[in-house]
Amino acid sequence: MSDGETPAVPSLYEVLQLAKDYPTAGEEHNLLTLALAMPMGGLIIFDGPSSSGKTHSVNSASSTFTNHENLVYTVPTTASETALYYEFDKMNQRPVHNWGDLASMEKTWEPILKDHGDGRPSNRKVTDVTLGEVVDKTIDPPATLILQIATDNEDINLNDYAEIKNRALILTSDGSREQTEAVMALQAAVEARTFEPSVGEERAAQIREYMTGVFETAEIFRTRRESEKPMATFWNPAAEAIAEAEVIPPMFNEARRDNQRLFKFMRAVALYHHAERLMTFLEDGERVMIVTPVDCWYAMVIFGEKMLRSALNLRGHDIEVLSLLREKPSSYTVAEIQQMLIQGGHNVTDRDVRRSLENMFTKGYVIRHDDSPITWQASPMASYMDYKSKIDWEDVVEKAAETVRANLPAEQ
């Protein structure tokens, strides 16, 4: 590339390959979601079994940005609340805060996260050992908060923190046997020095430069306080057509927030394509970036299935458990279900199975027989998991174009 030449806009496939060069096995949807969501800002919950690579995936996604070593502040799981305020300078310099396993932090995280969740700085008086006096320390809210939760830890349950859960994009790490085999094979390749990156050094530098530009562009859409107004917003003229297609199933109230999450991720994809997207002014003077049907399509491919399952109140191991019960129309104990899942290649504990069944029982997906021992089977409502949206992308494009023509001057 000659001096002054603008680097080619990388495809999302290239971004994914660069993230996997960290190196990382599998986790394609999570890596792309993290890389696209980090510049957009907000709250991300990343749950999954212990030792399933959540921190590694965060580091892998952040490696797609320039100077990524200084992008993410990983909160030590052993840090006390007071100790974090002594780190305020370092925390305030890094736009992404990655909170490790919350269950191991006792209540360290609650005061800070409650402040940051409301868009407020978190303040505390601490003793400055160099001055020998009490001073105020402030941790500013970061652009993006990532909260990790180990689903096999009995000390924490995401459902107990509804306010945090309702504001977040929620990802789940892959704890399957197949993923473990892929990770071990990659580890062996690295140890044997046979692993080779997919992206060359020059192209990797170009991709990181572009991705860092996404972060910089995001500043005009971001606010640090609830009282602030951003310099620009997004306009998604395809939103109504997508809503009409019932991409998000409306069976449960959760669909309301999942619909908003999906639209936010569509904005994140548009932000990624900022170099190719129109920034314009509406009649009321508002500056907007237009979210295109292409952005919506990418968002559906990367994130749509997660939103569909979330709207159906199916998360974690629910799909595996419910699919098994539908295939075997009888009733089974927790231990029997666990053994069948393990034989099918899923790494699950009896606690995973029990929590999944209890969650689905409250939503009507399974029937509990109070025998001795208790047994479970799929209910007629389990057929909801076959839900398919009625989206017609040609119709989405046509309606989006009509909306744009009706709201923008002809010269634009």
Each language-model region and where it sits:
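Terminal-proximal interaction/regulatory segments of ATP-powered molecular machines
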Residues: 312-412
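Phosphate-sensing "switch" segment of ASCE/P-loop ATPases
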Residues: 139-144, 152, 158-320, 324, ...
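Structural motif
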Residues: 21-31, 251-260
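Short, hydrophobic-biased segments on the C-terminal half of alpha helices
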Residues: 62, 263, 354-358
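Conserved ASCE/P-loop NTPase catalytic core
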Residues: 22-205
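Charged, amphipathic alpha-helical linker segments immediately N-terminal to NTP-binding catalytic cores
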Residues: 1-28
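Long, charge-rich low-complexity segments
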Residues: 61-85, 89, 308-337
